[in-house]
C-alpha cells in the first residue's frame, strides 16, 4: 500500500527569524530590539528549512498591522501592543508589513520575491488571513480605488447596524 505524502508546515514570524537582538527593551525601537526582514530568508536558509522535511512555510505576521514604528502612518499608542504591534490587528488587508522590507516602497516586490525563493526551494507558502481581527484605526493605502475601508460608510449613530463593520457607543468619544 502506497503511503500518502505528509504535509510538514514550518511556521515562522519573519519579524523574528533574522533578528539577531537577544536582549529586548520593553517598548523599544527597531534599532534597540531589531527586526527580521524578508531578505533574511536566503536560498541557504530556505534550503536548511527544507532539509527539516518541510513542505510548506507559514509566514505569520506578513499583512500590514497596527504599529508605532516609523515606516507608515502610526496608530494611536494606546491601541498598539508595544511599538511593533500585534500581527492580528490588521490595518490593511491589501498591504504588507513595511517593517519586514529592506526598502519600504518595494515591500510588495520583496514579499513576492520571498514567495518565489520559497517555491524555488521546493516549498509552498501559507500566510495568515485574519478575518474579523482588524485594527481600531483600519486604513488601507494600497487598496483598489473601488474598495472602501472597513467602517468608512458605517452609521456611527447606532450601536449596532447589520450594515456596519464595527460596533459603536453613540455619543461617547473613545478615551484612551
Where on the chain are the PLM-derived regions?
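N-terminal structural segment of carbohydrate-active enzymes
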Residues: 1-124, 132-143, 148-157, 162, ...
Amino acid at each position: 500500500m502506497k503511503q500518502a505524502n505528509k504535509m510538514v508546515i514550518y511556521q515562522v514570524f519573519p519579524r523574528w527569524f533574522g533578528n539577531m537582538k537577544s536582549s529586548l527593551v520593553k517598548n523599544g525601537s527597531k534599532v534597540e530590539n531589531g527586526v527580521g526582514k524578508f531578505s533574511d530568508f536566503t536560498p541557504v536558509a530556505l534550503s536548511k528549512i527544507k532539509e527539516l522535511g518541510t513542505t510548506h512555510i507559514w509566514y505569520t505576521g506578513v499583512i500590514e498591522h497596527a504599529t508605532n514604528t516609523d515606516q507608515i502612518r502610526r496608530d494611536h499608542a494606546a491601541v498598539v501592543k508595544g511599538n511593533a504591534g500585534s500581527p492580528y490587528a490588521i490595518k490593511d488587508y491589501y498591504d504588507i508589513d513595511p517593517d519586514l522590507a529592506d526598502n519600504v516602497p518595494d515591500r510588495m516586490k520583496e514579499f513576492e520575491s520571498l514567495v518565489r525563493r520559497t517555491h524555488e526551494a521546493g516549498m509552498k507558502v501559507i500566510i495568515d488571513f485574519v478575518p474579523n481581527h482588524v485594527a481600531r484605526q483600519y486604513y488601507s493605502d494600497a487598496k483598489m480605488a473601488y474598495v472602501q475601508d472597513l467602517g468608512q460608510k458605517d452609521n456611527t449613530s447606532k450601536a449596532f447596524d447589520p450594515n456596519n463593520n464595527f460596533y459603536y457607543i453613540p455619543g461617547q468619544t473613545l478615551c484612551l
